[in-house]
A protein has these predicted regions:
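Compositionally biased low-complexity segments at domain edges in trafficked proteins
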Residues: 233-268
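Solvent-exposed, conformationally flexible loop/turn segments
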Residues: 123-125, 173-177, 238, 300-304, ...
Protein backbone atom coordinates (compact mmCIF):
# COMPACT_ATOMS: atom_id res chain seq x y z
CA UNK A 1 0.00 0.00 0.00
CA UNK A 2 2.83 2.38 0.91
CA UNK A 3 4.66 1.76 -2.36
CA UNK A 4 1.39 2.13 -4.28
CA UNK A 5 0.64 5.47 -2.62
CA UNK A 6 4.13 6.75 -3.37
CA UNK A 7 3.81 5.70 -7.01
CA UNK A 8 0.42 7.40 -7.25
CA UNK A 9 1.68 10.69 -5.78
CA UNK A 10 4.77 10.63 -7.99
CA UNK A 11 2.68 9.93 -11.08
CA UNK A 12 0.31 12.79 -10.25
CA UNK A 13 3.24 15.13 -9.75
CA UNK A 14 4.91 14.10 -13.01
CA UNK A 15 1.65 14.65 -14.91
CA UNK A 16 1.23 18.05 -13.31
CA UNK A 17 4.80 19.01 -14.19
CA UNK A 18 4.44 17.88 -17.80
CA UNK A 19 1.06 19.57 -18.27
CA UNK A 20 2.27 22.92 -17.03
CA UNK A 21 5.81 22.95 -18.41
CA UNK A 22 5.19 25.51 -21.14
CA UNK A 23 3.21 27.83 -18.88
CA UNK A 24 5.69 27.48 -16.02
CA UNK A 25 8.44 29.38 -17.78
CA UNK A 26 7.79 32.16 -15.29
CA UNK A 27 4.40 31.64 -13.68
CA UNK A 28 3.72 33.70 -10.55
CA UNK A 29 1.52 31.92 -8.03
CA UNK A 30 -1.59 33.87 -7.08
CA UNK A 31 -1.79 34.30 -3.32
CA UNK A 32 -5.53 34.21 -2.66
CA UNK A 33 -5.31 35.08 1.02
CA UNK A 34 -5.22 38.71 2.02
CA UNK A 35 -1.72 39.69 3.03
CA UNK A 36 -0.82 42.11 5.78
CA UNK A 37 1.39 45.09 4.91
CA UNK A 38 5.06 44.28 5.02
CA UNK A 39 8.08 43.62 2.88
CA UNK A 40 8.06 41.23 -0.04
CA UNK A 41 11.22 39.18 0.39
CA UNK A 42 12.20 37.66 -2.95
CA UNK A 43 14.51 34.65 -3.23
CA UNK A 44 15.86 33.33 -6.54
CA UNK A 45 16.52 29.63 -6.00
CA UNK A 46 17.52 26.90 -8.43
CA UNK A 47 17.24 23.15 -7.97
CA UNK A 48 20.54 21.91 -9.36
CA UNK A 49 22.43 18.64 -9.58
CA UNK A 50 26.02 18.59 -8.39
CA UNK A 51 28.50 16.41 -6.54
CA UNK A 52 28.56 16.53 -2.75
CA UNK A 53 31.34 15.14 -0.54
CA UNK A 54 30.34 14.07 2.97
CA UNK A 55 33.98 13.94 4.15
CA UNK A 56 35.81 16.64 2.16
CA UNK A 57 38.97 16.40 4.27
CA UNK A 58 39.16 12.63 3.78
CA UNK A 59 39.13 11.94 7.51
CA UNK A 60 37.85 12.70 10.99
CA UNK A 61 38.16 16.38 11.94
CA UNK A 62 36.61 16.28 15.40
CA UNK A 63 37.78 13.27 17.43
CA UNK A 64 40.67 11.27 15.98
CA UNK A 65 42.05 13.55 13.29
CA UNK A 66 42.68 10.42 11.22
CA UNK A 67 41.34 8.85 8.07
CA UNK A 68 39.29 5.78 8.93
CA UNK A 69 37.13 3.13 7.32
CA UNK A 70 34.15 2.97 9.66
CA UNK A 71 31.92 2.53 6.58
CA UNK A 72 33.12 -1.04 5.99
CA UNK A 73 29.71 -2.46 6.84
CA UNK A 74 29.67 -6.21 7.57
CA UNK A 75 28.57 -8.05 4.45
CA UNK A 76 29.93 -5.37 2.15
CA UNK A 77 33.65 -5.78 2.82
CA UNK A 78 35.76 -6.18 -0.28
CA UNK A 79 32.95 -4.98 -2.55
CA UNK A 80 32.22 -1.40 -1.51
CA UNK A 81 34.83 1.33 -1.16
CA UNK A 82 34.73 2.74 2.40
CA UNK A 83 36.44 5.93 1.21
CA UNK A 84 33.79 6.73 -1.40
CA UNK A 85 31.95 9.71 0.10
CA UNK A 86 31.22 11.81 -3.01
CA UNK A 87 27.74 11.41 -4.46
CA UNK A 88 25.60 13.09 -7.08
CA UNK A 89 22.83 15.06 -5.37
CA UNK A 90 20.22 17.75 -5.97
CA UNK A 91 20.48 21.01 -4.03
CA UNK A 92 18.58 24.25 -3.60
CA UNK A 93 21.03 27.09 -4.40
CA UNK A 94 20.39 30.83 -4.23
CA UNK A 95 21.13 33.31 -7.04
CA UNK A 96 21.35 37.09 -7.04
CA UNK A 97 18.53 37.81 -9.51
CA UNK A 98 16.10 36.38 -12.04
CA UNK A 99 18.82 35.80 -14.64
CA UNK A 100 20.15 32.91 -12.51
CA UNK A 101 23.67 33.68 -13.72
CA UNK A 102 25.41 34.57 -10.45
CA UNK A 103 25.28 32.45 -7.31
CA UNK A 104 24.64 34.48 -4.18
CA UNK A 105 27.60 33.82 -1.87
CA UNK A 106 26.87 32.64 1.64
CA UNK A 107 28.09 34.92 4.39
CA UNK A 108 30.66 33.47 6.81
CA UNK A 109 27.88 33.23 9.41
CA UNK A 110 25.96 30.77 7.24
CA UNK A 111 28.65 28.67 5.58
CA UNK A 112 27.83 25.98 8.12
CA UNK A 113 24.53 25.27 6.30
CA UNK A 114 26.52 22.96 4.05
CA UNK A 115 24.23 20.76 1.96
CA UNK A 116 21.09 22.59 3.06
CA UNK A 117 19.26 25.06 0.87
CA UNK A 118 19.49 28.81 1.53
CA UNK A 119 17.97 30.30 4.66
CA UNK A 120 14.61 31.98 3.98
CA UNK A 121 13.90 34.83 6.40
CA UNK A 122 10.86 37.02 6.97
CA UNK A 123 9.19 39.11 9.64
CA UNK A 124 5.57 38.55 10.60
CA UNK A 125 3.51 40.56 8.10
CA UNK A 126 5.96 40.06 5.24
CA UNK A 127 5.51 37.91 2.15
CA UNK A 128 8.06 35.35 0.98
CA UNK A 129 8.33 35.03 -2.79
CA UNK A 130 10.47 32.17 -4.12
CA UNK A 131 11.32 32.13 -7.81
CA UNK A 132 12.25 28.48 -8.34
CA UNK A 133 14.08 27.42 -11.48
CA UNK A 134 14.50 23.70 -12.02
CA UNK A 135 17.90 23.00 -13.53
CA UNK A 136 17.77 19.33 -12.54
CA UNK A 137 16.89 16.37 -14.75
CA UNK A 138 13.55 15.54 -13.12
CA UNK A 139 10.56 17.47 -11.68
CA UNK A 140 10.92 19.02 -8.23
CA UNK A 141 8.89 21.44 -6.13
CA UNK A 142 9.16 23.58 -3.02
CA UNK A 143 6.77 22.94 -0.13
CA UNK A 144 6.97 25.12 3.02
CA UNK A 145 5.99 24.39 6.59
CA UNK A 146 4.39 26.98 8.86
CA UNK A 147 3.83 29.89 6.50
CA UNK A 148 0.54 30.52 4.69
CA UNK A 149 0.03 29.14 1.20
CA UNK A 150 -2.86 28.85 -1.24
CA UNK A 151 -3.48 25.64 -3.16
CA UNK A 152 -1.52 27.06 -6.09
CA UNK A 153 1.60 27.52 -3.95
CA UNK A 154 1.61 24.33 -1.85
CA UNK A 155 4.21 22.44 -3.87
CA UNK A 156 2.56 19.06 -3.28
CA UNK A 157 0.48 16.75 -5.49
CA UNK A 158 -2.41 14.81 -3.99
CA UNK A 159 -6.15 14.36 -4.51
CA UNK A 160 -7.27 17.83 -3.38
CA UNK A 161 -9.79 18.59 -6.16
CA UNK A 162 -7.54 21.24 -7.72
CA UNK A 163 -6.83 21.45 -11.44
CA UNK A 164 -5.07 23.42 -14.16
CA UNK A 165 -3.55 26.63 -12.75
CA UNK A 166 -3.71 25.32 -9.19
CA UNK A 167 -1.65 22.25 -10.09
CA UNK A 168 1.35 23.95 -11.65
CA UNK A 169 3.06 24.36 -8.30
CA UNK A 170 2.95 20.59 -7.66
CA UNK A 171 5.99 19.78 -9.80
CA UNK A 172 8.23 22.20 -11.68
CA UNK A 173 9.41 20.51 -14.85
CA UNK A 174 13.11 20.45 -15.82
CA UNK A 175 14.01 23.77 -17.43
CA UNK A 176 10.89 25.53 -16.11
CA UNK A 177 10.49 28.33 -13.57
CA UNK A 178 7.69 28.84 -11.05
CA UNK A 179 7.10 31.55 -8.46
CA UNK A 180 5.75 30.50 -5.05
CA UNK A 181 4.10 33.22 -2.93
CA UNK A 182 3.81 32.59 0.82
CA UNK A 183 2.33 35.26 3.11
CA UNK A 184 3.64 35.30 6.69
CA UNK A 185 0.73 35.92 9.10
CA UNK A 186 1.02 36.06 12.86
CA UNK A 187 0.33 32.32 13.20
CA UNK A 188 3.55 31.64 11.23
CA UNK A 189 5.61 33.50 13.83
CA UNK A 190 6.44 32.81 17.46
CA UNK A 191 3.53 32.28 19.83
CA UNK A 192 2.88 34.37 22.92
CA UNK A 193 5.52 33.54 25.50
CA UNK A 194 7.96 32.24 22.90
CA UNK A 195 11.20 33.88 21.85
CA UNK A 196 11.68 36.28 18.96
CA UNK A 197 11.62 33.68 16.17
CA UNK A 198 9.81 30.62 14.84
CA UNK A 199 11.58 27.86 12.92
CA UNK A 200 10.20 25.99 9.91
CA UNK A 201 11.43 23.93 6.97
CA UNK A 202 10.93 23.77 3.22
CA UNK A 203 11.63 20.85 0.91
CA UNK A 204 10.71 19.31 -2.43
CA UNK A 205 7.54 17.25 -2.19
CA UNK A 206 7.17 15.49 -5.56
CA UNK A 207 8.31 12.31 -3.80
CA UNK A 208 9.18 13.54 -0.33
CA UNK A 209 11.49 10.70 0.68
CA UNK A 210 13.53 10.53 -2.51
CA UNK A 211 13.60 14.30 -2.95
CA UNK A 212 14.94 14.93 0.55
CA UNK A 213 17.43 12.06 0.39
CA UNK A 214 18.61 13.65 -2.86
CA UNK A 215 19.34 16.81 -0.83
CA UNK A 216 16.40 19.19 -1.37
CA UNK A 217 15.65 20.64 2.07
CA UNK A 218 16.30 23.96 3.80
CA UNK A 219 15.36 26.29 6.72
CA UNK A 220 12.85 29.10 7.23
CA UNK A 221 13.15 31.52 10.17
CA UNK A 222 10.31 33.92 10.96
CA UNK A 223 10.95 36.87 13.29
CA UNK A 224 8.31 38.43 15.53
CA UNK A 225 6.78 41.69 14.26
CA UNK A 226 8.95 44.63 15.28
CA UNK A 227 11.88 42.41 16.31
CA UNK A 228 13.65 42.11 12.94
CA UNK A 229 16.65 43.90 11.54
CA UNK A 230 16.52 44.95 7.88
CA UNK A 231 17.72 41.50 6.79
CA UNK A 232 15.05 39.76 8.86
CA UNK A 233 17.37 38.55 11.63
CA UNK A 234 16.19 39.08 15.23
CA UNK A 235 17.54 42.13 17.06
CA UNK A 236 17.89 40.28 20.36
CA UNK A 237 20.42 37.67 19.15
CA UNK A 238 24.15 37.79 18.42
CA UNK A 239 24.54 34.42 16.67
CA UNK A 240 22.27 31.83 15.09
CA UNK A 241 23.06 28.29 13.96
CA UNK A 242 20.93 25.87 11.93
CA UNK A 243 21.83 22.19 12.29
CA UNK A 244 20.20 19.28 10.50
CA UNK A 245 20.83 15.95 12.22
CA UNK A 246 20.11 14.25 8.94
CA UNK A 247 20.38 10.64 7.89
CA UNK A 248 20.82 10.79 4.11
CA UNK A 249 20.07 7.39 2.61
CA UNK A 250 21.65 7.35 -0.85
CA UNK A 251 19.90 4.08 -1.69
CA UNK A 252 16.62 6.04 -1.51
CA UNK A 253 17.86 8.97 -3.59
CA UNK A 254 16.86 9.46 -7.23
CA UNK A 255 20.55 9.28 -8.11
CA UNK A 256 21.43 5.94 -6.50
CA UNK A 257 21.83 3.98 -9.75
CA UNK A 258 23.93 6.74 -11.30
CA UNK A 259 26.13 6.97 -8.20
CA UNK A 260 26.69 3.21 -8.06
CA UNK A 261 27.49 3.17 -11.77
CA UNK A 262 30.05 5.92 -11.32
CA UNK A 263 31.62 4.40 -8.22
CA UNK A 264 31.59 0.73 -9.18
CA UNK A 265 30.82 0.47 -12.88
CA UNK A 266 27.81 -1.84 -13.03
CA UNK A 267 24.77 -0.67 -11.00
CA UNK A 268 23.19 -4.13 -11.25
CA UNK A 269 25.92 -5.49 -8.96
CA UNK A 270 24.16 -4.07 -5.92
CA UNK A 271 20.56 -4.45 -4.80
CA UNK A 272 19.35 -1.23 -3.16
CA UNK A 273 17.00 -3.26 -0.95
CA UNK A 274 19.84 -5.40 0.46
CA UNK A 275 20.38 -4.49 4.13
CA UNK A 276 24.17 -4.35 3.92
CA UNK A 277 24.12 -2.23 0.78
CA UNK A 278 21.55 0.15 2.24
CA UNK A 279 23.46 0.59 5.49
CA UNK A 280 26.65 1.27 3.60
CA UNK A 281 25.01 4.09 1.66
CA UNK A 282 23.46 5.75 4.73
CA UNK A 283 25.25 8.84 6.01
CA UNK A 284 24.68 10.14 9.55
CA UNK A 285 25.41 13.80 8.99
CA UNK A 286 25.12 17.27 10.44
CA UNK A 287 24.24 19.57 7.52
CA UNK A 288 25.61 16.99 5.12
CA UNK A 289 29.00 16.59 6.83
CA UNK A 290 30.43 13.58 8.69
CA UNK A 291 32.96 13.54 11.52
CA UNK A 292 33.27 17.29 12.05
CA UNK A 293 34.03 18.10 8.42
CA UNK A 294 31.77 21.16 8.38
CA UNK A 295 32.87 24.70 9.26
CA UNK A 296 33.62 25.37 12.92
CA UNK A 297 30.60 26.85 14.74
CA UNK A 298 32.05 29.87 16.53
CA UNK A 299 30.62 32.18 19.18
CA UNK A 300 31.87 34.29 22.08
CA UNK A 301 31.40 33.90 25.80
CA UNK A 302 28.26 35.83 26.75
CA UNK A 303 26.80 35.93 23.23
CA UNK A 304 23.06 35.52 22.87
CA UNK A 305 22.95 32.37 20.73
CA UNK A 306 20.00 30.52 19.24
CA UNK A 307 20.32 27.02 17.80
CA UNK A 308 17.73 25.80 15.28
CA UNK A 309 17.88 22.01 15.23
CA UNK A 310 15.93 19.53 13.12
CA UNK A 311 16.09 16.06 11.61
CA UNK A 312 15.21 14.50 8.25
CA UNK A 313 12.49 11.93 7.57
CA UNK A 314 13.59 8.46 6.53
CA UNK A 315 12.13 5.06 5.73
CA UNK A 316 13.80 3.39 8.70
CA UNK A 317 11.87 4.81 11.66
CA UNK A 318 14.22 3.18 14.16
CA UNK A 319 17.01 5.43 12.88
CA UNK A 320 14.91 8.59 12.85
CA UNK A 321 15.25 9.51 16.52
CA UNK A 322 18.19 11.79 17.29
CA UNK A 323 19.45 13.28 20.54
CA UNK A 324 21.69 16.32 19.92
CA UNK A 325 23.95 17.03 22.89
CA UNK A 326 26.13 20.06 23.60
CA UNK A 327 29.27 19.51 25.65
CA UNK A 328 30.41 22.19 28.08
CA UNK A 329 27.31 24.41 27.92
CA UNK A 330 23.61 24.38 28.73
CA UNK A 331 20.66 25.76 26.78
CA UNK A 332 17.00 26.57 27.35
CA UNK A 333 14.54 24.55 25.25
CA UNK A 334 10.79 25.12 25.69
CA UNK A 335 11.44 26.94 29.01
CA UNK A 336 13.53 24.05 30.37
CA UNK A 337 17.28 24.13 30.93
CA UNK A 338 19.06 21.16 29.37
CA UNK A 339 22.14 20.11 27.44
CA UNK A 340 20.36 17.60 25.17
CA UNK A 341 17.14 17.41 23.17
CA UNK A 342 15.21 14.61 21.47
CA UNK A 343 14.08 14.86 17.84
CA UNK A 344 11.65 12.75 15.84
CA UNK A 345 11.34 12.87 12.00
CA UNK A 346 11.01 16.41 10.57
CA UNK A 347 10.77 17.82 14.10
CA UNK A 348 12.20 21.28 14.68
CA UNK A 349 13.47 22.70 17.96
CA UNK A 350 15.05 25.94 19.14
CA UNK A 351 17.61 26.17 21.93
CA UNK A 352 18.74 29.44 23.49
CA UNK A 353 22.26 29.49 24.86
CA UNK A 354 24.47 32.05 26.55
CA UNK A 355 27.83 30.27 26.41
CA UNK A 356 29.86 30.74 29.58
CA UNK A 357 32.60 28.16 29.22
CA UNK A 358 35.33 29.01 26.65
CA UNK A 359 36.91 26.21 24.68
CA UNK A 360 36.34 23.81 21.79
CA UNK A 361 33.38 21.54 22.50
CA UNK A 362 31.70 18.50 20.97
CA UNK A 363 28.17 18.67 19.54
CA UNK A 364 26.80 15.25 18.59
CA UNK A 365 23.94 12.79 18.47
CA UNK A 366 23.85 10.63 21.59
CA UNK A 367 22.42 7.58 19.79
CA UNK A 368 25.43 5.20 19.80
CA UNK A 369 24.98 4.02 16.21
CA UNK A 370 24.67 7.59 14.94
CA UNK A 371 27.68 8.81 16.90
CA UNK A 372 29.67 5.85 15.60
CA UNK A 373 28.51 6.73 12.10
CA UNK A 374 30.01 10.21 12.28
CA UNK A 375 27.10 12.39 13.41
CA UNK A 376 29.19 14.88 15.34
CA UNK A 377 30.91 18.22 14.97
CA UNK A 378 32.57 20.84 17.17
CA UNK A 379 31.78 24.36 18.29
CA UNK A 380 34.11 26.99 19.71
CA UNK A 381 33.35 29.43 22.52
CA UNK A 382 35.87 32.27 22.42
CA UNK A 383 36.66 34.39 25.49
CA UNK A 384 34.41 37.43 25.83
CA UNK A 385 37.33 39.74 25.05
CA UNK A 386 37.77 38.25 21.55
CA UNK A 387 36.58 40.58 18.75
CA UNK A 388 33.49 39.36 16.89
CA UNK A 389 34.50 37.34 13.81
CA UNK A 390 31.09 37.48 12.13
CA UNK A 391 29.53 40.91 12.67
CA UNK A 392 25.87 40.69 11.70
CA UNK A 393 23.94 37.71 10.42
Amino acid sequence: MRAHARSMFTALALLAGAAGASAQTHHAARARSATTPGRVRVYYIAAEESDWTYVPSGGDQAITGKKDDYRNVPGARGELDPNATTYRKARFREYTDSSFRTLKPRSPSWEHLGLLGPLLRAEVGDTIEVVLRNRASRPYSMHPHGVLYAKNAEGTAYLDSTRDEDRRDDAVAPGATFTYVWPVPERAGPAAGDGSTAFWLYHSHVDEGRDINAGLIGPIIITRKGMARADGSPKDLDREFVTDFGLFDESLSWYFAANVARLYGDPSRFDSTDKAVREFHQFFTINGFLEGNGPMLTMRQGDRVRWYVFTNPNEQSAWDIHSPHWHGQTAVVAHMRTDMIMLTPMMTAMADMIPDNPGIWLFHCHMPGHFGGGMYTRFTVLPATTPASHPGQ
